[in-house]
């Protein structure tokens, strides 16, 4: 899988693609179904399959620390997108300039001229461009004008519940890890780097490890029984998580 950081770096690496746009936070079962369908369309059109992400995520840019907790880091998201067979991931920097970009300019400059999109899969509630004036109908009209197909990415449900990153965050907030796993299609995982702490564990006779999660807000809190693998050996431990990181 090829990673392109910044829309300005798309050429000459990419010219023509089957594209979807979104946060893909968690790469859950709904995302996986969208990607499978996009793979089929890309193969039929003999085009690379591309995903456009935003960093930071738009809500993080506008809401800061009040934004919903991420389910996974960008690094982990890229791992799962590669597993799903994505050919190219474009990570667009979401900053003031991008936030103020008129919707029509985003379509013409980026989707048409830079990416030469031939097929676009997007949610019918997708909003984009300055003041969120761009929408699904606008993309459909642009598709007719510039020669690319626009398709509504379907909403997927499990037991009549819409699969979404929000639903997974709600399950985690209720400590319902099994339901979160059902929606994700995989166990919920947290990755981080062990860092130096205050070494308080040495004073109470218990070894401890501080793991930095590199996120503003954690989607889980509480104390969990965990299993740690070290040098091919497993050890049962307790893990404590707070909402703030």
Q: How would you label these PLM feature ranges?
A:
Residues 237-245:
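Single conserved hydrophobic/aromatic residue that forms the stacking wall/gate
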Residues 2-9, 90:
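Short acidic-hydrophobic, aromatic-tinged amphipathic segments that line or gate anion-handling sites
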Residues 97-207:
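Classical nucleotidyltransferase
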Residues 69-77, 101-107:
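Glycine-rich, highly charged phosphate/nucleotide-binding loops
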Residues 28, 81, 120, 180, ...:
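Residue-level signal for inorganic ion chemistry
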Residues 11-73:
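N-terminal catalytic cores of NTP/NDP-binding nucleotidyl/phosphoryl-transfer enzymes
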Residues 197-236:
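Phosphate/ribose-recognition catalytic cores of enzymes acting on nucleotide-derived substrates
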């Amino acid at each position: 899988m090829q990673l392109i950081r910044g829309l300005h770096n798309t050429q000459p690496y990419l010219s023509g693609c089957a594209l979807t746009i979104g946060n893909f936070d968690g790469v859950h079962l709904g995302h996986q179904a969208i990607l499978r369908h996009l793979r089929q369309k890309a193969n039929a059109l003999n085009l690379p399959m591309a995903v456009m992400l935003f960093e930071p995520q738009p809500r993080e840019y506008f809401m800061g620390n009040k934004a919903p907790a991420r389910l996974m880091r960008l690094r982990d998201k890229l791992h799962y997108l590669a597993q799903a067979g994505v050919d190219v991931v474009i990570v667009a920097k979401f900053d003031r300039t991008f936030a103020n970009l008129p919707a029509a300019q985003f379509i013409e400059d980026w989707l048409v001229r830079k990416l030469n999109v031939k097929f676009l899969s997007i949610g019918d509630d997708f909003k984009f461009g300055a003041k969120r004036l761009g929408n699904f109908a606008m993309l459909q009209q642009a598709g007719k004008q510039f020669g690319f197909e626009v398709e509504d990415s379907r909403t997927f449900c499990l037991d009549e519940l819409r699969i979404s990153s929000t639903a997974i965050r709600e399950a985690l907030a209720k400590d319902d890890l099994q339901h979160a796993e059902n929606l994700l299609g995989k166990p919920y995982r947290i990755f981080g780097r062990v860092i130096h702490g205050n070494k308080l564990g040495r004073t109470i006779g218990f070894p401890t490890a501080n793991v930095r999660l590199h996120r503003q807000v954690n989607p889980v809190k509480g104390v969990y029984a965990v299993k740690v693998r070290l040098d091919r050996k497993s050890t049962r431990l307790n893990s404590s998580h707070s909402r703030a990181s």
